[in-house]
Design a protein with these regions (language model features):
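Beta-strand-loop-alpha-helix segment that lines the small-molecule cofactor/substrate pocket
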Residues: 1-36, 51
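Alpha/beta-hydrolase-fold catalytic nucleophile elbow
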Residues: 5, 62, 167
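Residues that form or flank phosphate/diphosphate-binding pockets in enzymes
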Residues: 13, 39, 158
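Hydrophobic packing residues within well-ordered alpha-helices of enzyme cores
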Residues: 15-18, 40, 44, 149
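Predominantly a Rossmann-like dinucleotide-binding segment in NAD(P)-dependent oxidoreductases
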Residues: 27-28, 35-129
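C-terminal glycine/acidic-rich active-site capping loop/insertion
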Residues: 34, 70-82, 137, 162-173
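Contiguous beta-strand/loop segments that form the cofactor/metal-binding neighborhood of enzyme cores
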Residues: 98, 103-173
Length: 173
């Protein structure tokens, strides 16, 4: 059996190959989503499922106070950084997969629905040494709600709620 750190894969093609290998090898494959282990996140989902805020119309998630790969204090030149997988899109780098994936899994869990569509954008504002984005945002349409997700390696969140934040007909969490 295998536990994979989030996200499962870089592409649908890669995810299907993992699923195929799992079936052939008769091994379970599970994705670990560290945010789902947080007590506050689990309580929020419990309260939403119990109807505390009523019918949910909006879900929002922004990654917490983090500068992504710069959070760990490495001192590297731009050339060295450009060679790191974090900054190479083809290797799975970038803030979309690094942080927006948390909001995606949490909004699916909280809302209990499958998305109908998504609009997104990504940009590289400050990490010019690589081709992966350092900012991404998604607006996801569900049958009865919308989800707004943001993943960034550029902006410090201090004082700004990162989420999840849920708005419903009776109030917000």
């Amino acid at each position: 059996h295998v536990v994979v750190e989030k996200p499962l894969a870089y592409s649908t093609e890669h995810a299907m190959a993992i699923a195929r290998a799992s079936r052939i090898g008769k091994a379970d494959c599970m994705v670990n989503w560290p945010t789902t282990w947080q007590a506050s996140v689990r309580l929020g989902q419990k309260l939403v499922s119990e109807g505390v805020v009523g019918k949910v119309y909006r879900f929002q998630f922004r990654n917490p106070d983090s500068m992504g790969p710069f959070s760990y204090g490495q001192v590297m030149t731009d050339r060295q950084l450009g060679k790191e997988w974090w900054h190479q899109e083809a290797a799975g780098g970038g803030s979309l997969l690094d942080y927006c994936c948390y909001g995606t899994i949490l909004s699916n869990w909280y809302l209990g629905e499958k998305p109908q569509g998504v609009y997104g954008l990504k940009a590289n504002f400050n990490h010019r040494f690589g081709d992966a984005e350092d900012y991404a945002s998604l607006m996801v349409r569900y049958p009865e709600a919308v989800s707004i997700l943001e993943g960034t390696w550029n902006t410090i969140s201090s004082g700004y709620p990162s989420g999840p934040i849920v708005w419903g007909e009776k109030g917000a969490l």
